[in-house]
Amino acid sequence: MRRTKAEAEQTRNDILKAALILFDEQGYAQTTLSTIARKAKVTRGAIYWHFENKEEILAALAQAQFTELNSQINAAIAAPDTWQNLADNFIAYFRGLLKNPDRLRFCCIFNQHGRIPALEKLYRDYTALWQAQSREAVQRGKENGELHRDADPEYLYFYLMMIFTGLVELCLDQPDAPHLAQYCERVIRDTIALMQTL
């Protein structure tokens, strides 16, 4: 019997969900397509219908996690008050991170990029994208008066990523810590305010 588009999409989502759990619980290298198929309750053939290999599954997971964030960053850059919008988007991201187990799982996996070759390329690609977005945001901030005209885009990117990475680590290590969401918001707003003085 021919499957509907909705059924095919559900199968794809089931595969991604199973892979996300297994990559987190037993590691990317230790996870096979067979174990993903068993976890998702599908055949290996169903996996190959949607994905050629584990690398494609990993890339699809990254796309699912970062597409919305990247779209929001691009919208913030285009807005008149670029850096205020970026602060709002980063705060929303961390609120979602603390409330969404799947997002937390993926961040745990993504943070292993130094030990997983397939992740290393993804990490480099997304880092290059975020660095380009940061440069554009700095340029916009200079043009609209939010940042100093002589602000160094490379330093501001480094500074922002240092804060962002630290907050992600705290969310992964202590997701249930009291006041974490509130403190994340405060740190982000203070960071953006400080960057506007640099």
Annotate the PLM regions.
Residues 67-70, 74, 99, 117-144, ...:
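Amphipathic alpha-helical packing segments from all-alpha helical-bundle domains
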Residues 60, 74-101, 153-160, 181:
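Hydrophobic alpha-helical connector segments
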Residues 25-29, 100, 144:
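Short coil/turn segments at alpha/beta junctions that flank glycine-rich nucleotide-binding fingerprints
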Residues 1-26, 30-42, 56:
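Basic, helix-initiating cap at the start of DNA-binding domains
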Residues 90-93, 107-110, 160, 164, ...:
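Short alpha-helical scaffolding segments that buttress acidic/His motifs in well-ordered protein cores
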Residues 58-65:
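Alpha-helical DNA-contacting segments of helix-turn-helix folds
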Residues 98-118, 169-173:
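Amphipathic alpha-helical segments used for helix-helix packing
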Residues 41-51:
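Short hydrophobic/aromatic patch on the recognition helix
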